């Protein structure tokens, strides 16, 4: 089913209050958002909160420090009841989850049993994020290695993602593929084509701003991927540290101190009228003071929107 057919079908079943796998698809996800000023709420990964606190108190701390949401790994290590209770007590949102099995059991693996494990895990994540009141699951699309060729990963992962579409349609949740250091989909033009070939409104990109600085410029990716970007991850990166100390050392730089040209990056976010609603920090965590600093830095970055 292509985008046009899916949207027509969703409109019909919503009006008819039909039951079945399509009935719960989220109409708001599929509707084209009106033009207007881009607005982003702040979120951070739960693992970044290093204070020795209960789940509820970690959520409360995040809220006190100016964060509107928390991103969880999924399937979660907590029960749904625990998560919802802590969410309500803190008055915080849980808009996105990161599937935790896509590296160990990648969607590009040549073994069908391995792919099945990941598909089942992502299906659980789609239901989980819906139950939590969110709308998006982050998924790594695949991994290229010495034993898995680029072309093989491309075709295999696309087919696996297509197998996930019925679960996305049933829940109305989005599958957002993240650009990571997986030796795969290394240009924005290719990343755009990958999504367009899948051709479904509930499959797009979870764009990581810092991950591309190793070999590109995030503003280029943002303009090319455009409306295919569902959510944004926030990272900083230093090419100087990369060149002098090693690839992974490039991430060891504070927000606003690396090579992201934040006014230019956020101008691109504004230009595409990004309506994903969230900017989620994925940087080194720490105590209350460190997290407050991150929150303040994010405020400055968001201020460059227009």
At which residue positions do the language-model features occur?
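Glycine-rich, proline-tolerant flexible connector loops at the mouths of alpha/beta enzymes
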Residues: 72-88, 141-148
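Active-site beta-loop-alpha junctions enriched in small/polar residues
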Residues: 47-49, 73-75, 99-102, 142-144, ...
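A structural motif
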Residues: 67, 129, 134, 229, ...
């Amino acid at each position: 089913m292509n985008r046009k057919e899916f949207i027509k079908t969703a409109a019909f079943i919503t009006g008819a209050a039909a039951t079945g796998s399509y009935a719960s698809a989220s109409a708001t996800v599929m509707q084209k958002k009106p033009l207007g000023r881009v607005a982003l709420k702040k979120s951070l990964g739960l693992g970044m909160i290093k204070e020795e606190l209960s789940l509820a108190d970690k959520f409360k701390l995040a809220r006190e420090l100016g964060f509107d949401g928390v991103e969880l790994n999924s399937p979660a290590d907590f029960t749904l009841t625990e998560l919802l209770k802590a969410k309500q007590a803190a008055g915080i949102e849980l808009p996105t989850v990161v599937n935790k099995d896509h590296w160990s059991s990648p969607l590009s693996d040549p073994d069908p049993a391995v792919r099945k494990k990941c598909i089942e895990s992502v299906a659980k994540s789609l239901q989980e994020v819906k139950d939590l009141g969110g709308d998006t699951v982050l998924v790594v699309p695949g991994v290229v290695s010495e034993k898995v060729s680029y072309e093989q990963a491309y075709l295999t992962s696309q087919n696996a993602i297509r197998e996930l579409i019925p679960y996305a349609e049933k829940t109305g949740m989005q599958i957002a593929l993240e650009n990571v250091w997986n030796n795969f989909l290394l240009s924005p033009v290719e990343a755009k084509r990958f999504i367009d070939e899948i051709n479904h409104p509930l499959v797009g990109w979870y764009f990581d701003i810092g991950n591309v600085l190793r070999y590109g410029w995030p503003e280029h990716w943002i303009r090319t991927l455009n409306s295919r970007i569902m959510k944004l991850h926030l990272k900083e990166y230093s090419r100087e540290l990369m060149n002098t100390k090693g690839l992974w050392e490039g991430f060891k730089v504070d927000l606003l101190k690396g090579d992201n040209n934040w006014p230019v990056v956020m101008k691109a976010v504004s230009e595409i009228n990004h309506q994903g609603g969230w900017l989620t920090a994925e940087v080194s965590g720490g105590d209350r003071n460190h997290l407050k600093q991150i929150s303040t830095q994010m405020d400055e970055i968001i201020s460059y929107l227009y």
